[in-house]
């Protein structure tokens, strides 16, 4: 599971090493002194002399406006080769299609069961919000899927591009923040069970959910305030978010995406690591009694780190070195890594909900239209476990 998720990071580094000093400097007026030739990833041009190397490497494919046309961007040949290759036009839509096909029914059914068949405990509210975030993420992907399948042609207009891009990032990072909130709730329940009786209430749970949603909305807000669609020079392609003017890269996109990666991913993952680390120590201290819960907790932590770390590391690397030649076209590796990150919304239902035998029984009872009384004994047992440190399901 780890290798496919780390592949975009390895791809980004290989792109940089393969291009070396032959990568066209996207900030300079490139003059060819020896002509062009085919490189490992497409046409490359040998540079005569870069005029400057002190500008930051941008987040997306950076383009220059065509003369007397503010709607059209020119991209270097190497960037166009990555933008129109098989990865963004075949692999990425396949991953998005998998998220829609699996994430919609899995999260929709889980949300239905949580809302109708599970006692309304504080942990239930957190898991319901997580299911909503993952469900909404799957719902906003079809426009992006159509865009990539059409060969990077956005047919829905500027406003739809802004909303779709902001919704993609907002719901994905909202899921990360809610995962951190769930880890805090489980830490209190398992490590401090007596104190949890006073702390784990509706007020704390509601506050955590509000903070997660408001933070995600704030982090995604810049994506709705600036233009995102531009025509690719020499083609009929209307790009959505994949190519942005050079003049806008450092002014607002750089700080916006640095904040998105740090506050929306690295800080929540750090909180999850601390909470689940303490939880794992508490479970390990009890020996084999809670071995299943121990393995499940480790799986939850590994899934979050493996899903979100590669794409956000690539995002930060874009700004880590002021020299454009340092990392090359890392955005070509970032696009598939972002698609891999969305797969977490398919994994969440199975490691948080369906892994529980009690939850599967509730799903079966609902699908078979069994009366609610058939699962009342299980509901009473779950409600009675509110003050315990461990219960057999994931619904703490």
Swiss-Prot record:
Pfam families: 7tm_1 (PF00001)
Alphabetically ordered keywords of this record: Blood coagulation, Cell membrane, Disulfide bond, G-protein coupled receptor, Glycoprotein, Hemostasis, Membrane, Receptor, Signal, Transducer, Transmembrane, Transmembrane helix
Cited InterPro entries: GPCR_Rhodpsn, GPCR_Rhodpsn_7TM, Prot_act_rcpt_4, Protea_act_rcpt
Membrane topology, from the record: Multi-pass membrane protein
Disulfide bonds: 161-240
Cytoplasmic side: 116-120, 184-203, 277-295, 356-396
Annotated site (Cleavage): 59-60
Segments traversing the membrane: 95-115, 121-141, 163-183, 204-224, 256-276, 296-316, 332-355
UniProt note on tissues of expression: Highly expressed in the spleen. Slight expression in the heart, lung, skeletal muscle and kidney. No detectable expression in brain, liver or testis. Also detected in platelets.
Protein modification: A proteolytic cleavage generates a new N-terminus that functions as a tethered ligand.
Region (Disordered): 28-62
Residues spanning the signal sequence: 1-16
Any one GO CC term of the record: plasma membrane
GO biological process, any: platelet aggregation
Listed GO MF terms: protease binding; thrombin-activated receptor activity
Glycosylation: residue positions: 68
Annotated PANTHER family: G-PROTEIN COUPLED RECEPTOR, PROTEINASE-ACTIVATED RECEPTOR 4
General function of this protein: Receptor for activated thrombin or trypsin coupled to G proteins that stimulate phosphoinositide hydrolysis. May play a role in platelets activation.
Protein name: Proteinase-activated receptor 4
Organism: Mus musculus (Mouse)
Source lineage: Eukaryota, Metazoa, Chordata, Craniata, Vertebrata
